[in-house]
């Protein structure tokens, strides 16, 4: 199996997974042309489109792809008006490319957000990013916390295939909270180098995210003051505070 990331709109990722038979699955197609060009170059035949949620930067290529390739579209109920032909829900299993893709419901960024998991890949849309997480446009902080906790239950070698290249910004925020954390500062240097050479930081291994992502694994970090006191409350309360701080963070 081969995984390709297609960068669009400066920081969006479209994911394309294909096998030796040149059949492929397209995840969150935010546009058509880039995908068409890759498929033509590699002689790939799309057999399915996966949608994680309904935002335009993840669905704008769907109708053109359906028309050109006559491809079925799997997605949550919220994506029906954007071309979904097969609605998915928690626990559904999709058998394609001789693999099983399991559906996870991940409310938070949107209420109907889902992810698709087939080891080692987890296509999580805008729920989890490297060193960060998505904004709460529809769901609550509690919703998002438990969605991320669900992702954190996966094996450490899981590869997080997120929808945006926000790693450096996320690390800058994390370092503002933990300025003396050497793991964060060292990884930031690596990310800066990747950014300089226009290389992606994704997919990212879950075991790495457990070291650098304060939203995924807050109890792995030494909080002080008000944040430390929040550790004594329900688990999601600290997550909400961090998300609020991130919303107001100036890069």
From Swiss-Prot:
Matching InterPro entries: Clx_II_MBL, Glyoxalase_II_hydrolase, HAGH_C, Hydroxyacylglutathione_Hdrlase, Metallo-B-lactamas, RibonucZ/Hydroxyglut_hydro
Note on how the cofactor is bound: Binds 2 Zn(2+) ions per subunit.
UniProt superkingdom: Bacteria
SMART domains (UniProt xref): Lactamase_B (SM00849)
Molecular function as annotated in GO: hydroxyacylglutathione hydrolase activity; metal ion binding
Keywords: Hydrolase, Metal-binding, Zinc
Residues the entry annotates as binding Zn(2+) 1: 53, 55, 109, 126
SUPFAM superfamilies: Metallo-hydrolase/oxidoreductase (SSF56281)
Pathway per the UniProt entry: Secondary metabolite metabolism; methylglyoxal degradation; (R)-lactate from methylglyoxal: step 2/2
One annotated GO biological process: methylglyoxal catabolic process to D-lactate via S-lactoyl-glutathione
EC number: 3.1.2.6
Necessary cofactors: Zn(2+)
Pfam families reported in the protein's UniProt record: HAGH_C, Lactamase_B
Principal EC category: hydrolase
Catalytic activity line of the entry: an S-(2-hydroxyacyl)glutathione + H2O = a 2-hydroxy carboxylate + glutathione + H(+)
Residues noted as binding Zn(2+) 2 in the record, renumbered to the chain: 57-58, 126, 164
Gene3D superfamilies cross-referenced by the UniProt entry: Ribonuclease Z/Hydroxyacylglutathione hydrolase-like (3.60.15.10)
Similarity annotation: Belongs to the metallo-beta-lactamase superfamily. Glyoxalase II family.
HAMAP family hit by this protein: Glyoxalase_2
Quaternary structure (record): Monomer.
Its job: Thiolesterase that catalyzes the hydrolysis of S-D-lactoyl-glutathione to form glutathione and D-lactic acid.
Name this polypeptide is given: Hydroxyacylglutathione hydrolase
Organism for this UniProt entry: Wigglesworthia glossinidia brevipalpis
């Amino acid at each position: 199996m081969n995984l390709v990331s297609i960068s669009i709109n400066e920081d969006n990722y479209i994911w394309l997974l294909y096998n030796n038979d040149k059949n492929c699955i397209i995840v969150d197609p935010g546009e058509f042309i880039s995908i068409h060009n890759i498929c033509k170059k590699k002689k790939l035949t799309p057999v399915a489109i996966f949608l994680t949620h309904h935002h335009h930067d993840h669905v704008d290529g769907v109708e053109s792809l359906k028309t050109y390739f006559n491809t079925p579209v799997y997605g949550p109920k919220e994506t029906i008006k954007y071309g979904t032909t097969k609605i998915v829900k928690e626990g559904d299993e999709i058998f394609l490319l001789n693999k099983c893709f399991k559906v996870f419901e991940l409310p938070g960024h949107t209420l109907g957000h889902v992810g698709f998991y087939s080891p080692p890949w987890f296509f999580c849309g805008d729920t989890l990013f490297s060193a960060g997480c998505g904004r709460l446009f529809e769901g609550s902080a509690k919703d998002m916390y438990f969605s991320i906790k669900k992702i954190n239950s996966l094996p450490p070698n899981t590869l997080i295939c997120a929808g945006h290249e926000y790693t450096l910004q996320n690390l800058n925020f994390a370092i503002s909270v933990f300025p003396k954390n050497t793991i964060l500062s060292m990884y930031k240097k690596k990310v800066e180098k990747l950014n300089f050479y226009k290389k992606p930081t994704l997919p990212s291994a879950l075991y790495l995210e457990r070291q650098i992502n304060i939203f995924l694994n807050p109890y792995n970090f030494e909080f002080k003051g008000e944040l430390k006191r929040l550790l004594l409350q329900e688990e999601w309360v600290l997550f909400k505070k961090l998300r609020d701080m991130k919303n107001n963070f100036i890069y």
